[in-house]
Design a protein with these regions (language model features):
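A structural signal for multi-pass alpha-helical bundles of membrane permease subunits
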Residues: 1-196
C-alpha cells in the first residue's frame, strides 16, 4: 500500500478516538435524533419502518445508543494497540514456526496471542476505564435527564446541583475504586515477562 495512503487511512481510523467525547456524542445525536436523524431517514427511505423511532426517549434504547458511541470511540485505540503489539513481534519467530510445520491457527494461539498479552491488557484496561468514565457522551445525547444517568452523572448532579458535597465525593470515590482495580490488573499483567 502507498505510504501516503496508509497515513491518511490511519488518521481517519483514529479520528473517533481523537475527537473530544462531547463532540462524538453530538455527532451521534444527529444520527439517532428521533425526528430527523440520519438513521431514521435511512430506515424510512428503504422502507424498513413507517414512523421515526424514538432512540433517545427510552432508557433501554438510549443505553444501546450510548454503548454504540463508546464502542465507536474505543475501537480505534484498541486497534492501534493490537497493531503495535503485532508489529513488535519479530518476524523470525513466525518463520521458525512455519519451518517447524505450524499452521496459522497454532501460530496465532501459541505465538501471537501469548506475545500480545501485555498489549491486550493495556487495551482492555483502557477501554474498561473509558466505559466507566462515560459522562460527556451521555450529556450530549440526553442532557442531564434520568434516562441516561450513571454514577458519574449522579455524582455531578449531587455535588453541583444539590450541593451535597459529601455524598457526591463518596460516589466519585466509588468510581475511583473501580478504576484503581482495573489499573492494578493492568500493572500486574504489565510486569509479566514476555519471552521471544
Amino acid at each position: 500500500m502507498n505510504v501516503k495512503c496508509a497515513g491518511v487511512l490511519l488518521a481517519m481510523a483514529i479520528m473517533p478516538w481523537a475527537l473530544p467525547p462531547f463532540v462524538n456524542g453530538v455527532l451521534w445525536k444527529f444520527v439517532f435524533f428521533s425526528g430527523y436523524g440520519f438513521l431514521n431517514k435511512l430506515l424510512i427511505g428503504i422502507g424498513i419502518i413507517d414512523a421515526p423511532i424514538q432512540f433517545l426517549a427510552s432508557r433501554w434504547t438510549l443505553l444501546i445508543v450510548i454503548s454504540v458511541v463508546v464502542v465507536w470511540r474505543s475501537v480505534p485505540f484498541m486497534a492501534l494497540v493490537c497493531l503495535a503489539g503485532r508489529q513488535s513481534i519479530p518476524s523470525e519467530i513466525y518463520e521458525a514456526a512455519k519451518i517447524d510445520g505450524g499452521t496459522g491457527k497454532h501460530i496465532f494461539r501459541y505465538i501471537t496471542l501469548p506475545l500480545m498479552k501485555p498489549f491486550l491488557a493495556l487495551g482492555i484496561t483502557s477501554t474498561s476505564v473509558t466505559a466507566i468514565n462515560v459522562f460527556d457522551e451521555i450529556v450530549a445525547l440526553s442532557g442531564y435527564s434520568d434516562l441516561g444517568k450513571n454514577i458519574l452523572m449522579d455524582s455531578y448532579l449531587t455535588t453541583f446541583t444539590f450541593l451535597n458535597f459529601g455524598k457526591g465525593s463518596a460516589m466519585t470515590y466509588i468510581v475511583l475504586f473501580f478504576a484503581m482495580i482495573l489499573g492494578i490488573f493492568y500493572l500486574r499483567n504489565l510486569n509479566k515477562e514476555v519471552d521471544y
